[in-house]
Every structure is written in structure tokens, then in C-alpha cells.
Amino acid sequence: MAFLVFAFLTLMAVETYGSLFQFRLMINYLTGKLPILSHSFYGCYCGAGGSGWPKDAIDWCCQVHDCCYGRMSASGCDPYFQPYNFSYINKNLQCVETDTSGCPRRICECDRLASICFQQHDATYNSSNIDPKRKGCGTKSPPCPN
């Protein structure tokens, strides 16, 4: 039991730096869910890595988000650890970076759009799609949208 507590706390500490922490806050604000529990191993794309065909609308949100992070990485940004500023006022998320062309703003937009996608499809959330082993995902993946 002590090992499980240690592992959980370590995972929480590792993933609270930079934009991953802010992304979690956005998801929590819009869905009321704790992303470390609700989205970390959801479907074929939510959480670290991803391949195969998305299982549902929530998983599609994650696939599109992975593609967005891929574009950020390809352009020299670090979407996992680059902090950014955002506001949440009257149930509205806004990226508030002053440099609208810089990495922080673009990464924030990736996270904001994914969080809104989760909110829009929250009624379809299916806890049976949580699977750390990602069974049934296959190898054929959809192309990233432009």
C-alpha cells in the first residue's frame, strides 16, 4: 500500500510542471473531473502516447490534442513543460499570453481546445474506456488534421 501511495505522489509531482499542470486545471474547470484519474489512460490516445483508432468522441479529442502537441514539438516548442498563462472567468477559458505567435500561446490554445472538446462530449464519457494497456487500439491511426 505504501508503494502505491508513493507511486501516485511521484506521478503527481512529475506531471505538475509546465503546461501539463495547466492543462489539467483547464480540464477540471470545464468538466469537474480530476484528469489524472479520468483521462490519463482513457481510450487509445488520452495520456502518454497513443496509437490506433480512437474509441469515442473523448478519445478523438485526445488524438487531435496529440497532433497539436506534435506540431508544437516540430516547430521547436516544448508542449509538455512550457508554462503559459490562462484565465477562467464566467466558465470561459482564455489564453492570456501577450505574444500571440509564441510557443506559450500556441500550446495554451492546444490545451484550451482539447478541454472545450472534453466539455462538449462529457455526456459520452465512458469509464469502461479507461485501460492502461490500451487493448483493442490496433495499429491503424487516423491522420492528424491540418
Swiss-Prot record:
Ca(2+) binds at Y45, G47, G49, D66. Residues 1-18 form the signal peptide. Glycans are attached at N85, N126. One of its GO terms (cellular component) is extracellular region. CDD domains: PLA2c (cd00125). Keywords: Calcium, Disulfide bond, Glycoprotein, Hydrolase, Lipid degradation, Lipid metabolism, Metal-binding, Secreted, Signal. The active site is at H65, D111. Its cofactor is Ca(2+). It is found in: Secreted. It catalyses: a 1,2-diacyl-sn-glycero-3-phosphocholine + H2O = a 1-acyl-sn-glycero-3-phosphocholine + a fatty acid + H(+). Its main location: secreted. Disulfide bonds join C44-C137, C46-C62, C61-C117, C67-C144, C68-C110, C77-C103, C95-C108. Expressed by the skin glands (at protein level). GO terms for molecular function: calcium ion binding; calcium-dependent phospholipase A2 activity; phospholipid binding. Belongs to the phospholipase A2 family. PLA2 catalyzes the calcium-dependent hydrolysis of the 2-acyl groups in 3-sn-phosphoglycerides. This is Phospholipase A2.
